[in-house]
A protein has these predicted regions:
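Preference for extracellular/luminal or secreted protein segments
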Residues: 1-50, 253-254, 263, 284-542
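Active-site mouth loops of central-metabolism enzymes
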Residues: 28-38, 102-116, 197-211, 279-285
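Active-site-adjacent structural elements in enzyme catalytic domains
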Residues: 61-78, 111-127, 333
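Short beta-strand elements of ligand-binding domains
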Residues: 79-87, 134, 331, 479-486
């Protein structure tokens, strides 16, 4: 359960809460996200809206740290500063340690490494002024076609996910940041995307209790400070068994947030909405009503609030009686309590990790990656017999987004080059380009970069994958190695491939580990933390 406040922390909460006007209390419930706004914009906005949390971005980490320090100086009440760091602070480009993605963590299955990773992420986050992390993802990836969870999930075993997630979140919170478990009541069942519609956790409630419910109870008992509901329904609990698609998302459901999460599961911490711009939420009400209805449903902090309008809309909602003042102040109390637990009233930015810590964090990431590599298919010898000077072709198939840190697999090529191999690289080649390049090399490494939400709405191989020509390459070249630098489920779509490993993401440490496995320097010892789909003969329900 939540760690009790110290005497000093409790006194700060009571004093601060007692001095809050209604407008200030409402402001604490807003998280403003403006990634391209100037410093002057933020300072002007702060004079107009007393927001409680801020998400921003800068051209460099040093600029970001300086900006956050200035913002905290101007804030009457310390700000929560959230970030997604699902696989490390390296998600902020050019900074911090890059860990494997969550499914790789599940494949490594090492609680001690999870705890060290939690320490690393927290230390690197606080050093730049981030104090609230939107991780861990504790969704169970039961549906291999789910386009959101995939390698962001630790797996599909509730007991293992509970064990790894609690080690992770407790370590982060012990080192000065608030962890957020997401996405209540649980993603990973539907094959659709809440960016595009409200998705459904269609499990009967007794089965939900034995699976998702077990994980949620575990993180609550472990003391998680924050929970993020998704734009996801749980119709069997909500009373929509006959018409499940009509059930509202958790972000608009007092039945889920109050009756289930708070009363049945006993959660007393902060509840933050998922992104308020997603269609899974916006389809349910007019824009002017969404913030009011979300807060009225039990949300404490409204994520990605409209900075120009939602503050006034919430105040008007109180005046109209749609939200009670008691509820506003109750949510404001929970916001202040989380700030107090983080001691933000004393220090908003932590010390930089020492040189020894930086080495430890990097070694931890590599150890986790080395333990995560999983053999998906080994009908041929995994080790590539290559000598210095051999010519190799590396091929990346995937959708890149450099501004989000999703770049080509350059570390993989560098590692091969450091071992004396002559590397030629192709990105999303056509079949003809691939065949021609493969004719003059000793080996080909085909690297499949398929990660969640790239593109939205599907976890399947699309777009560039359609023209990759893997069939002709497979039959024409005798020495081909396939690596899933993302979804391991690509194995389902590559039945003829006889040599395939999973690295579960493109983190630098995972690229290094994959090279070591292919060249015989490391044994792949990861265990697939999800069930692989199978082709079966079965009748249709017609």
């Amino acid at each position: 359960m939540l760690k009790p406040l110290t005497t000093t922390q409790a006194a700060w909460v009571e004093k601060t809460l007692g001095n809050l006007s209604l407008a200030q209390a409402v402001g604490q419930l807003l998280c403003i996200s403006q990634f391209n706004a100037s410093r002057d914009y933020w300072l002007r906005l702060m004079e107009q809206v007393p927001f409680g949390a801020a998400r921003a971005r800068a051209d460099s980490v040093d600029e970001y740290r300086t900006f956050l320090a200035e913002l905290q100086t101007h804030a009457d009440i310390p700000l929560l500063v959230p970030a997604n760091m699902e696989h490390g602070a390296a998600e902020l480009q050019g900074y911090g340690t890059d860990f494997p993605w969550a499914m790789g963590m599940g494949a490594a299955n090492d609680e001690a490494l999870m705890a060290l990773m939690g320490r690393a992420i927290a230390s690197e986050a606080r050093a730049i002024g981030v104090n609230w992390l939107f991780n861990p993802v504790i969704d169970l990836n039961y549906n291999f076609d789910n386009p959101i969870t995939n390698i962001r999930s630790l797996g599909d075993n509730p007991t293992q996910v509970s064990r790894l997630a609690t080690a992770w979140l407790q370590a982060m919170q012990a080192h000065g940041v608030a962890a957020t478990a997401k996405h209540f009541p649980g993603d990973g069942v539907d094959d659709r995307d809440q960016h595009l519609l409200t998705t459904v956790n269609s499990l009967p409630f007794p089965q939900w209790q034995e699976t998702f419910g077990l994980v949620w109870q575990a993180v609550i008992e472990a003391g998680v400070m924050c929970i993020m509901p998704g734009h996801i329904s749980l119709p069997d609990y909500q009373g929509y068994r006959a018409q499940p698609q009509d059930a509202p998302p958790a972000t608009l459901s007092r039945t889920l947030l109050i009756d289930l999460l708070r009363q049945e599961l006993g959660y007393q911490g902060l509840i933050v909405s998922d992104n308020a711009s997603m269609i899974g939420l916006t389809v349910h009400a007019a824009a002017e009503d969404l913030a009011v209805e979300s807060i009225a449903s039990g949300i404490d902090i409204y994520l990605n609030a409209d900075p120009e309008h939602d503050f006034d809309r919430l105040l008007q909602g109180v005046r109209d009686g749609r939200i009670g003042e008691d509820q506003i102040y109750g949510s404001a109390r929970r916001v202040l309590e989380m700030k107090a637990r983080l001691n933000l009233f004393e220090e908003s930015i932590g010390p930089a990790p020492t040189a020894a810590e930086q080495i430890l964090f990097g070694d931890t990431a590599q150890a986790m990656a080395d333990k995560s590599i999983t053999v998906l298919r080994d009908e041929e010898d995994l080790q590539m017999e290559l000598v210095a000077g051999a010519k190799v072709l590396t091929v990346t198939y995937g959708q890149l987004m450099p501004r989000m840190g999703l770049t080509d697999l350059e570390i993989f090529d560098e590692e091969l080059g450091e071992r004396g191999l002559q590397v030629t690289h192709l990105l999303n080649p056509t079949s003809d380009e691939l065949r021609q390049a493969a004719e003059t090399v000793d080996a080909v490494f085909v690297n499949l970069f398929k990660i969640p939400m790239m593109p939205l709405g599907t976890a399947r191989m699309t777009d560039t994958f359609r023209n990759w020509g893997w069939r002709s390459l497979y039959t024409r070249h005798p020495n081909v190695a396939y690596t899933a630098f993302g979804s391991p489920y690509v194995a389902y779509e590559l039945p003829p491939v006889t040599r395939l490993i999973a690295a579960y993401g493109s983190s630098a440490c995972s690229q290094r580990a994959a090279v070591k496995v292919w060249l015989g320097e490391l044994e792949a010892e990861g265990t697939l933390p999800v069930r692989m789909p199978r082709v079966e003969i079965k009748a249709l329900p017609i």
